[in-house]
């Protein structure tokens, strides 16, 4: 495995990261590729004084994340798994081994990320404390959770996925959007992405933005819209709504979501109810294409009332911030009752336009 670390004015954090990788995971300098993306803190001179270090210097600085990673892969002819790191994410004991174990637990798993412990959190107040707690077994492992999107600053990518998905999209600039695109491409090719419940990294500082700015964010958003025909990529489940599903974990639920988007709510159900049968309806064909990798998804408009679920009835029908967009929400609810199992429930959330989070920005 090769570790690619992209740094911008993070010299001290980078030194800490390199030492932690050596001490806690046995990763030596020959397995590292350090990219200095225009730092002004002495990183370049330090790299040039270390003959055993693999590194790249972006003289002008502000190179796109996609171009950096693609160039590093090509320059060093990487033909193995890759761990992409931002220096603000510090390795904790056993995390690399646990991520690798999960990565190869199933051939369909293409990439994994650790759980993140944030600086100053109740779990561990600082990095030294976090290391001690892991070594003493005070931070318990959790369930592995399948994800739609992985963090751009700490992700392990399997060689087979890298080869099949190909290069990172060089039209995109910001790391988070580059990873957004790569995750979607991987999912559509049949790969699964996971957060490893037994691997932990510590976010010791906020990510440096370098010369990234709003212009790059707007440009990326426009390019993603053109490529995927989606205004945004929702990878955060509506846990407030989904918390009303209270059956035991092994219950073979049948769940339908109207307006399922890319399937993040249905994926939450899959993670918490592995025996559930999942169905979705989504009007956006691109979003449905992603959701189809998770559930049985129909592309269509629920208000046309021509759905055919093959006689299946559902324990739950979910409307997450959907009803307010319909011409006839009451009629649609009455129509969907036809597919509701006796004793089943409709779960719906409707945004409150008078909520302080909306009003304060007016």
Residue map of PLM features:
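Short, well-formed alpha-helical segments that are part of the catalytic scaffolds
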Residues: 10-25
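A conserved acidic beta->alpha catalytic loop
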Residues: 36-44, 62, 260
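Glycine-rich, basic loop-to-helix element that forms the pyrophosphate-binding segment
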Residues: 59-76
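A recurrent flexible, glycine/aromatic-enriched loop bordering the glycosyltransferase active site
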Residues: 67, 136-157
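Short beta-strand-to-loop acidic/aromatic patch adjacent to the donor-nucleotide binding site
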Residues: 79-90
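Conserved donor NDP-sugar-binding/catalytic core segment of glycosyltransferases
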Residues: 90-126, 352
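A short, conserved alpha-helix in the catalytic core of glycosyltransferases
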Residues: 148-166, 171-199
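S-adenosyl-L-methionine-dependent methyltransferase catalytic module, highlighting the catalytic core
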Residues: 170, 327-362
């Amino acid at each position: 495995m090769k570790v690619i670390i992209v740094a911008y004015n993070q010299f001290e954090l980078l030194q800490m990261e390199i030492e932690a990788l050596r001490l806690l995971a046995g990763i030596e300098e020959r397995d590292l590729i350090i990219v200095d993306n225009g730092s002004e803190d002495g990183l370049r001179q330090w790299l040039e004084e270390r003959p055993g270090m693999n590194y790249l210097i972006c003289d002008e600085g502000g190179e796109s994340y996609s171009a950096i990673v693609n160039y590093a892969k090509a320059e060093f002819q990487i033909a193995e798994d890759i761990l992409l790191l931002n220096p603000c994410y510090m390795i904790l004991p056993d995390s690399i081994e646990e991520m690798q174990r999960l990565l190869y637990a199933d051939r369909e798993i293409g990439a994994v990320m650790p759980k993140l412990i944030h600086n100053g959190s109740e779990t561990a107040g600082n990095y030294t404390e976090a290391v001690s707690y892991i070594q003493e077994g005070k931070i318990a492992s959790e369930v592995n959770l399948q994800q739609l999107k992985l963090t751009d600053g700490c992700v392990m990518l399997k060689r087979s996925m890298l080869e099949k998905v190909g290069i990172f999209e060089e039209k995109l600039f910001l790391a988070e959007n580059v990873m957004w695109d790569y995750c979607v491409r991987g999912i559509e090719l049949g790969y699964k992405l996971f957060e490893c419940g037994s691997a932990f990294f510590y976010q010791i500082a906020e990510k440096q933005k370098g010369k990234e700015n709003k212009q790059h964010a707007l440009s990326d958003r426009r390019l993603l819209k053109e490529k995927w025909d989606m205004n945004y990529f929702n990878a955060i489940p509506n846990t407030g709504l989904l918390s009303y599903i209270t059956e035991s974990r092994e219950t073979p639920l049948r769940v339908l979501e109207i307006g399922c988007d890319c399937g993040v709510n249905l994926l939450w159900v899959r993670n918490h109810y592995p025996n559930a049968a999942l169905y979705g309806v989504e009007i956006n064909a691109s979003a449905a294409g992603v959701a189809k990798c998770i559930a049985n998804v129909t592309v269509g408009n629920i208000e046309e009332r021509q759905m055919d679920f093959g006689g299946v009835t559902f324990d739950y029908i979910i409307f997450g911030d959907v009803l307010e967009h319909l011409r006839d929400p009451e009629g649609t609810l009455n129509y969907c009752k036809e597919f509701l199992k006796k004793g089943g429930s409709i779960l719906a959330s409707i945004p409150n336009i008078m909520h302080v989070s909306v009003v304060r920005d007016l």
